[in-house]
């Protein structure tokens, strides 16, 4: 009997390590996707097409968390996909939060100091002291994608996401 392949896509800035404690039955083969650097001014559709090249099987299940959920919907346009599972994500731009919709109109997201995330540990330890050390270790482990170029790209793409042809029930 052929095993079902499921690809897991973490959310923005997150590492595939967020899935480390998930357990699946022996009938499922789990594969993890990681964020790749975006090309300058790359559309989310073009990015999804590049990410889709990492999916080698057909009839797969794609699971995406948050912004990863948006990405797997876009990827499903380029691969043979049996099912899409969204976790803490949106199915259409209509479901974006009010702050995201406001950012769309005001471009306020471009003012976010994403370069601070590179040194999040130093900032947190300075502000909160050693009592936050355990939490900082978790941030280092699970939020490993901190390149400001990637973060600015990802935030802009979610704010301006126009939806895609794939319909998620």
Where are these regions (language model features)?
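Short hydrophobic segments within beta-strands
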Residues: 8-9, 63, 87
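Short, flexible active-site-adjacent loop segments at beta-strand->alpha-helix junctions, enriched
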Residues: 12, 66-67, 89-93
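Flexible "cap/lid" loop of the alpha/beta hydrolase fold
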Residues: 80-114
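Helix-loop "lid/cap" segments that line or gate small-molecule binding pockets
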Residues: 119-132, 141-142, 158
């Amino acid at each position: 009997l052929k095993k079902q392949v499921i690809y897991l896509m973490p959310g923005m800035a997150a590492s595939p390590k967020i899935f480390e404690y998930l357990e699946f039955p022996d009938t499922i083969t789990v594969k993890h996707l990681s964020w790749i650097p975006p090309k300058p001014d790359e559309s989310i559709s073009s990015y999804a097409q590049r990410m889709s090249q990492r999916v080698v099987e057909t009839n797969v299940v794609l699971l995406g968390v948050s912004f990863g959920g948006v990405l797997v919907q876009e990827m499903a346009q380029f691969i043979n996909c049996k099912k899409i599972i969204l976790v803490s994500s949106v199915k259409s731009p209509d479901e974006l939060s009010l702050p995201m919709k406001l950012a769309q109109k005001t471009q306020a997201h471009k003012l976010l100091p994403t370069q601070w995330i590179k040194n999040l540990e130093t900032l947190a330890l300075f502000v909160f002291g050693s009592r936050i050390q355990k939490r900082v270790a978790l941030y280092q482990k699970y939020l490993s994608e901190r390149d400001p170029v990637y973060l600015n790209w990802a935030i802009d793409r979610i704010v301006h996401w126009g939806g895609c042809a794939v319909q998620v029930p």
